[in-house]
Amino acid sequence: QYFHSNIYAIAEDNQGEMWVGTRGNGLKIGDSWYRNEVSDPASLSENNVFSLFRDRKDRMWIGTFGGGLELAEPTTDGKYKFRHFLQQKFGLRMVRVIEEDDNGMIWVGTSEGVCIFHPDSLIADSDDYHLFNYTNGTFCSNEIRCIYRDTKGRMWVGTSGSGLNLCEPEDNYRSLKYEHYGTSEGLVNDVIQSILGDNNGNLWVATE
């Protein structure tokens, strides 16, 4: 039943249900499919689901490519409705990756930089987040491909074209200090596809 869709993301919720995000065919939760319905503002905003993330309060966040960030909210009939975020303030519609840091802050990688927020605050006020990108001098590329939290709680951000960045929030997340690593520091390519740490503290970086 999945094989006719291009699968981009898989996650498991706290009930043991599998969530499957596809390119062009929406989101499958358990046995139910969820897709964009133009007449229903509580439906999925976009059928391209590129990332799924379960936060420490077991909320399920959905990154769409074209419709921004979604929060799945259960309904009384056992189904889900979706709240939409990040589109209004900066028009952040292209979401590739979602990660959480040790402080419970959510980091969202978009085509316009990294968006950081506390989930409780964003739910209360959809404009309560910080955006870091090339425009405000944080990264050399706005296109974020991956985000990884290492065993020391440090956040690594991989970009498309400007390498790898080790990021450290400052001033209560109002600014972001970073160290940049690119081809001049030994990377084969500045397009970062994936990041993973091993049990020895090494960081493995996949590039183009």
Where are these regions (language model features)?
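Carboxylate-rich, polar loop motifs that coordinate divalent cations or form catalytic acidic clusters
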Residues: 1-208
